A protein has these predicted regions:
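Function-determining sites in protein domains
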Residues: 2-12, 16-159
Length: 159
């Protein structure tokens, strides 16, 4: 009787661990991670490395995109092509992502609720809401470039 109880407990524990791992690694769409039902700000910040190893921040480029506009839909479609999953940093409450030469941020506020998505070129870690998650991609450089091109087209900034 005691052996069968131990076996059942071990099987239940193993099932719980597998369910937890599946939940953590389950792919979630980046397009679904951000609320596109309201205007949002798309900001691109670029850093330039100096000879002494320090970083200089170039002037950020930012634009407010209205819901349903072609630019907002293009941003949503670009994000739909990428997935992310939770990681240990998500559970630990870590909010820091590595620094990169280019950063892209989407921010909106509706009914007092802030929505945020932050991508750093060269990293597969991103800020999603109030936590750090890991993308199912090697790094977000291509996505950052896509979103930067959308912003340049929307704001008329030549690059």
């Amino acid at each position: 009787m005691t052996r069968s109880v131990k076996r059942v407990v071990l099987v239940l524990l193993a099932a719980a661990v597998l369910a937890f791992a599946a939940w953590m690694l389950w792919p979630r769409s980046l397009g679904g991670a951000f609320a596109f039902d309201q205007p949002f700000t798309l900001t691109v910040t670029e850093l330039e490395m100096q000879e002494d190893g320090s970083w200089t921040v170039k002037e950020p480029v930012s634009s407010v995109l209205e819901q349903g506009t072609p630019a907002a839909e293009t941003v949503r479609e670009a994000l739909e092509g990428y997935s992310y999953h939770l990681c240990l940093s998500s559970l630990a409450g870590d909010r820091l992502v590595p620094i990169g030469e280019q950063s892209v941020f989407l921010d909106s506020v509706s009914d007092g609720k802030k929505d945020h998505l932050g991508l750093i070129a060269g990293s597969n870690r991103l800020g999603c809401g109030d936590r750090v998650v890991q993308g199912y991609f090697r790094d977000s450089t291509v996505l950052c470039e896509q979103l930067s091109a959308i912003l340049r087209g929307e704001s008329g900034v030549a690059n």
